[in-house]
Amino acid sequence: MTTDEGAKNSRENPTATVAEQGEDVTSKKDRGVLKIVKRVGHGEETPMIGDKVYVHYNGKLSNGKKFDSSHDRNEPFVFSIGKGQVIKAWDIGVATMKKGEICHLLCKPEYAYGATGSLPKIPSNATLFFEIELLDFKGEDLLEDGGIIRRTKRRGEGYSNPNEGARVQIHLEGRCGGRVFDCRDVAFTVGEGEDHDIPIGIDKALEKMQREEQCILHLGPRYGFGEAGKPKFGIEPNAELIYEVTLKSFEKAKESWEMDTKEKLEQAAIVKEKGTLYFKGGKYVQAVIQYGKIVSWLEMEYGLSEKESKASESFLLAAFLNLAMCYLKLREYTKAVECCDKALGLDSANEKGLYRRGEAQLLMNEFESAKGDFEKVLEVNPQNKAARLQIFMCQKKAKEHNERDRRIYANMFKKFAEQDAKEEANKAMSKKTSEGVTNEKLAVSHAVEEEKPEGHV
C-alpha cells in the first residue's frame, strides 16, 4: 500500500487504522485502549488525577455511526481526571494527552460501557471510537477560592484523611521562583505546621489527602507565608509557592464525640493558649484553627454539671471574642459580626463583644448599626474613650458617605437632564427641518401650478 493509499484508508476507516497502528495506553497492556496522535500538543505537562479537563470530541460506534459530539452542542465537555466521572478509557487516554493535542482512541467494551451499554445509542459490548481534542486542563481548586491548587501525582491508599489535630509524617519540597528553599521529612500536628515553618496551605491540603498520596500544591500568598514572607527561607512577602508533598503516615486526632466533657475542657485550655500565641505572632489563620476547636467541642455540649457549664461558657465566650478579633485582622467582617453575635448571646452586655461588632460594622459601612453598638459600650462602661471616638468616626463617615452619594446622584441627574435637553433640541431641529422641507415643497408646487397652460389640447 502506498503512503497516499494509507492516508486515504485512515480517513475513510479511522477505526481500523487505530486498531492496527494504535499505541496501547493501558497499564495492563491488554490493548483495551489504543491511541493515535493526530495533532501533537504543546508543552510537556499532561493532566494529573483530579485535574479539571476541557475537551471537544466526536464519538462513533465501530461501524462509523456517530452517537455523540460536543461540537453539536457548541460547548466543551468538562470533567475531572481519575474521579470515575467518565468511562475508564477516557480517564486513561486523556491523561496521556498534552494541551492542544488531538488524538483518536479505540476503546474496548470493558473500558467503555461493557455488557450494559448505554441505550438507546450504545448497544451492549460495543467498541467505541473517539476523536478527542484537549483544549485545556488545570489543577483541583481545593478550597474553591483559588488559594490552593492541587495536582495529584500518585493516588493515596484507602478513604481516610487526617483531621485537625492529627499527627502526620510527610516529605515535602518547597519551591519559589524555580528555587528549592525547603526539602525534608517532618512530623507535626495538623493545624500547627507554622511551628515547623510549614505554611497553613499544607495543613489545609493534608485534610484532603490519603496515606501515601503524592501531590503538587500551588499556594497563593494567603495560604503561603503571606505578607510577612519567610526570611529564614529567603521568601519575599506575598510570594506564590509550589510544594510537592507526600503523606507517609498519620494518626487521627480524637473526634468531638470520642471525648468526654472533662477531656474537652482540658483540651480547650490548651488550644486557647496555643491560639493566643499564634495571634500574638500575627498568625491569625492558625489562631482561628485553635479557637475553632473550642467551639466544635463545647458549643453543642449538653448535660453538664454547674461547674462544667460555667467553665464551658467561659471558654466559648473567650473563643468567640478571639475569633472575632482574628476575623477583623483577616478583613472577614461578616464572620467577625457572627462571632460577636454568638458571644453576645452568652453575655449581652459584653464590652468586647459590642465594641468588636461595632468595629466590624463600621468597616462594612453599616454606620448606624456600628454607632448603636458603640453607644451600648458606653452604657456598659462610660469611661471607654475608644468607643466615644468611634461614635464620632461613625458620624463623620456617615456624613462623608451621604455627601458622596449626593454628588453621585447630582451628577447622574445632571447627565440625565443634559441628555433630555439634547434629545429635545434634536427633536426641535428635526421638526424645524421637516417643516422647512414641507414649505419648500409647497412653494415649488405653487410655482408649477402657475406655469400650467389655461387650456388642454
From Swiss-Prot:
Region (Disordered): 1-27, 423-457
Means of activity regulation: Inhibited by both FK506 and rapamycin.
Acetylation in keyword set: yes
Location within or outside the cell: Cytoplasm; Nucleus
PROSITE patterns, per the entry: FKBP_PPIASE, TPR, TPR_REGION
UniProt modified residues of type Phosphoserine: 445
Top-rank taxon: Eukaryota
GO CC, any one term: cytosol
Residues bearing the modification N6-acetyllysine: 28
SMART domains: TPR
Domain PPIase FKBP-type: 50-138, 165-251
TPR repeat boundaries on the chain: 268-301, 317-350, 351-384
GO BP annotation list: chaperone-mediated protein folding; response to bacterium
The record's account of how the chain is modified after translation: Acetylation impairs ability to promote interaction between Akt/AKT1 and PHLPP1. Deacetylation by SIRT7 promotes interaction between Akt/AKT1 and PHLPP1, leading to suppress Akt/AKT1 activation. Ubiquitinated, leading to degradation in a proteasome-dependent manner. Deubiquitinated by USP49, leading to stabilization.
Residue numbers carrying N-acetylmethionine: 1
Record's keyword terms, sorted: Acetylation, Chaperone, Cytoplasm, Isomerase, Nucleus, Phosphoprotein, Repeat, Rotamase, TPR repeat, Ubl conjugation
Class of the enzyme per the UniProt entry, highest EC level: isomerase
InterPro entries assigned: FKBP4/5/8-like, PPIase_dom_sf, PPIase_FKBP_dom, TPR-like_helical_dom_sf, TPR_rpt
Record-linked PANTHER family: PEPTIDYLPROLYL ISOMERASE
Note: The relative resistance of New World monkeys to glucocorticoids is associated with a high level of expression of FKBP5, but is also due to intrinsic differences between the human and the monkey proteins. Human FKBP5 has a much lower effect on glucocorticoid sensitivity.
Protein name listed in UniProt: Peptidyl-prolyl cis-trans isomerase FKBP5
Organism of this sequence: Aotus nancymaae
Taxonomic placement: Eukaryota, Metazoa, Chordata, Craniata, Vertebrata
